[in-house]
Amino acid sequence: MAARFSIQPIGRFAGESQPVKRPKEFACFSYDDNHEFRLDGSSLKYYYTPQLGADLSKGFDTFQKLDDTGDDHLDSLLKTIVAHEQETGKKIDANVVTWRGMMTKIMATPFDNMDGFEMNATLYQVCPSFIEENNAYKVASRSNEGNNNRRRRGPPLEVMQFWGYKFETLSTLPAPWAETPREFIENRENEVVNNKAQYCSVVRTGIGKSVLCLGGEVDAIWDSKPEEKGSPINWVELKTSAEIRNTGDMENFNRKLMKYWIQSFLLGVPRIVVGFRTRDGILVEAKDIETHRIPETVNSYPNPKWNADMCVNFAATFLDWLSANITDEGVWRIKREPQSPTIELFKVEETGHGDILSDEFKNWRIKLALGPSNES
């Protein structure tokens, strides 16, 4: 029997934003150039202004592309949590553990009527909900997206996706500017693009009554990381978008700003640099946007297409509902069909936790619950 959460009418989520806690990084991890997990910050990149006029299609034929069709579950995030808990000797206090991408989908739901989603969730040790993307749904959605793209005019979807990674390559250095050879800086346009390396931030944040542990990739840092854990970090999110030529383009861009804002808001990223490009992928502008100013900017236009406070209030209310309905073990499916006015929740496995939780994580949590060993 499925429980249903009504998205409509979204007017009930209007009003002042429910309380939110500033995201604080308490751990991080990296994937190297081969996408191997590393429990460190070795893949951190540093922002450096890109050269305008660059062709974002250049290097597409040598693109070292990550195959992300496999199901990695929450494994890397859980490994990082285990290492943190081993260091502190206590369990993190979050009651939701998930990837930033899952929370982005949830927060965008009131104003994103076209995209559906499927997630798997499980309860472990009474309180926390661990939520992952349903991989089969992700793969099928991408296949449909590719089929739809073949029917539209313009560059292939794969090329347009590459433009975003090319912009990241043009806008980042592997070390601070003072430590980077001039030859490397001037040769960025010829660098082989590789999206396998990633730096992932793990933060504690809060929306309404829920305390969240989120993991997500950050593209670059503006200056350097502060020594003290939990201090604000000058992260930079990098995006590409078609240049704005008319009112319709501006409306489309304001719609895109919703996900830009949510993604950055959830990890505490204060700055977004948008690379505006021509229709055939030539970089014409790099615009610096402060994350906290996006909601007021969008609201300054007539008939704004989304509202930040409503996104927060929707997420807070939905997470409360989820907590009240996921009350025992097993694997639960969180499902929204495209254009559906409801989100469904139902069990797909009566017992256990599926593959959402790794054996390493479960064994560690059992050991932690038993307390200090009496072995001498």
Curated annotation (Swiss-Prot):
Presence of the UniProt keyword Nucleotide-binding in the record: yes
Record protein name field: Decapping nuclease RAI1
GO BP, one annotated term: mRNA processing
Entry superkingdom: Eukaryota
Cofactor dependency: a divalent metal cation
Family membership noted in the UniProt record: Belongs to the DXO/Dom3Z family.
Subunit: Interacts with RAT1; the interaction is direct, stabilizes RAT1 protein structure and stimulates its exoribonuclease activity. The interaction also stimulates RAI1 pyrophosphohydrolase activity, probably by recruiting it to mRNA substrates.
Details of cofactor binding: Divalent metal cation.
EC number: 3.6.1.-
Location (main, coarse): nucleus
Locations listed in the record: Nucleus
Name of one Pfam family that matches: RAI1
UniProt keyword terms in alphabetical order: Hydrolase, Metal-binding, mRNA processing, Nuclease, Nucleotide-binding, Nucleus, RNA-binding
GO CC list: cytosol; nucleus
Catalyzed reactions per annotation: a 5'-end NAD(+)-phospho-ribonucleoside in mRNA + H2O = a 5'-end phospho-ribonucleoside in mRNA + NAD(+) + H(+); a 5'-end (N(7)-methyl 5'-triphosphoguanosine)-ribonucleoside-ribonucleotide in mRNA + H2O = a (N(7)-methyl 5'-triphosphoguanosine)-nucleoside + a 5'-end phospho-ribonucleoside in mRNA + H(+); a 5'-end triphospho-ribonucleoside in mRNA + H2O = a 5'-end phospho-ribonucleoside in mRNA + diphosphate + H(+)
Binding residue positions for substrate: 200, 217, 239, 263
Database matches in InterPro entries: RAI1, RAI1-like_fam
Function statement: Decapping enzyme for NAD-capped RNAs: specifically hydrolyzes the nicotinamide adenine dinucleotide (NAD) cap from a subset of RNAs by removing the entire NAD moiety from the 5'-end of an NAD-capped RNA. The NAD-cap is present at the 5'-end of some RNAs and snoRNAs. In contrast to the canonical 5'-end N7 methylguanosine (m7G) cap, the NAD cap promotes mRNA decay. Also acts as a non-canonical decapping enzyme that removes the entire cap structure of m7G capped or incompletely capped RNAs.
Residues binding a divalent metal cation: 168, 219, 237-238
Gene Ontology molecular function: metal ion binding; mRNA 5'-diphosphatase activity; nuclease activity; nucleotide binding; RNA binding; RNA NAD+-cap (NAD+-forming) hydrolase activity
Enzyme superclass (EC): hydrolase
